UniProtKB/Swiss-Prot annotation:
EC number: 4.2.1.20
Family to which the UniProt record says this protein belongs: Belongs to the TrpA family.
Protein name: Tryptophan synthase alpha chain
The reaction(s) this protein catalyses: (1S,2R)-1-C-(indol-3-yl)glycerol 3-phosphate + L-serine = D-glyceraldehyde 3-phosphate + L-tryptophan + H2O
Listed InterPro entries: Aldolase_TIM, RibuloseP-bd_barrel, Trp_synthase_alpha_AS, Trp_synthase_suA
Active site: 49, 60
Gene Ontology cellular component terms for the protein in this record: cytosol
Primary role: The alpha subunit is responsible for the aldol cleavage of indoleglycerol phosphate to indole and glyceraldehyde 3-phosphate.
Domain of life: Bacteria
Quaternary context: Tetramer of two alpha and two beta chains.
Alphabetized HAMAP family for the sequence: Trp_synth_alpha
Keywords assigned by UniProt, alphabetized: Amino-acid biosynthesis, Aromatic amino acid biosynthesis, Lyase, Tryptophan biosynthesis
């Protein structure tokens, strides 16, 4: 059984949802990035969603764009990212690890080479933010060849046809968008998601994780009560890094507290 399936089964048995933080690999430096990831795991993260920094992050709001710039300026190349991913996998053999990134990085490496590198580093899933599902075939074929789950986005305004495609072609989990637009804790999660979750369930989709604008424990609880298998929080996590760049101890302390609070909200009584 794969890591995502094991995680969702384990959590369902305890009446819990998953809480998944996102950070950019190498932010603010590769060394501190490892300490941050260790803190996320130690504080209760159920899985990790990690970004490979890219110079033109289209779907990201200002917080994650700033993280990308910090990571690039500290010398975080794709090679460094894969070295860190290999270390993370060795430390946390059961933790699901997903990448959230842009197609240019995949094309630069070569699609086949990229997915092989992911498999070698122990990555479980890849979400390519700027590849719509109807253009995803060559990525899906390579992902399948190397045992990597292709993750697809279910947007809030999706037609039933789109949700059917997402359900049939995706693996691992389904990234459920709470609203359209760019990422960011600056803009809160939007529409009720119950109808989307019901439609995905009808099509036997991989479990849905709600993302975009998730910054408070109440939102995690609401997502799970509406039928999502959990929630992903990116900008709110990265904002804590940004706000504590001059004090790494405070950064790790604040990150730990945030993760503990968000994870506590995923436990339904």
């Amino acid at each position: 059984m794969d890591r995502y399936q094991e995680l969702f089964n384990r959590l369902a048995a305890k009446n819990e949802g998953a809480f998944v933080p996102f950070v950019t690999i190498g932010d603010p430096t590769p060394e501190q990035s490892m300490k941050i990831i260790d803190t996320l795991v130690a504080s209760g993260a159920d899985a990790l969603e990690l970004g490979i920094p890219f110079s033109d992050p289209l779907a990201d709001g200002p917080t994650i764009q700033a993280a990308t710039i910090r990571a690039l300026e500290s010398g975080t190349t794709p090679i460094v990212c894969f070295e860190l991913l290999t270390q993370i996998r060795a430390k946390y053999p059961d933790m699901p690890i997903g990448l959230l990134m842009y197609a240019n990085l995949v094309f630069t490496a070569g699609i086949e080479t990229f997915y092989k590198k992911c498999a070698d580093a122990g990555v479980d899933s890849v979400l390519i933010a700027d590849v719509p599902i109807k253009e995803s075939e060559e990525f899906r074929v390579a992902a399948e060849k190397y045992g990597i789950h292709p993750i697809f986005i279910a947007p809030p305004n999706a037609t039933d046809e789109t949700l059917k495609s997402v359900s049939e072609l995706g693996g691992g989990y389904t990234y459920l968008l709470s609203r359209a637009g760019v990422t960011g804790a600056e803009t809160k999660a939007g529409k009720p998601i119950r109808h989307l979750v019901e439609s995905l369930t009808k099509h036997n989709a991989p479990p849905a994780l709600l993302g975009f604008g998730i910054s408070e424990p109440a939102q995690v609880k609401e997502a799970i009560e509406a039928g999502a298998a959990g929630a992903i929080s990116g900008s709110a996590v990265v904002k804590i890094i940004e706000n504590n760049l001059s004090d790494h101890t405070a950064m790790l302390d604040n990150l730990g507290q945030f993760i503990r609070d968000m994870k506590a909200a995923s436990k339904l009584s």
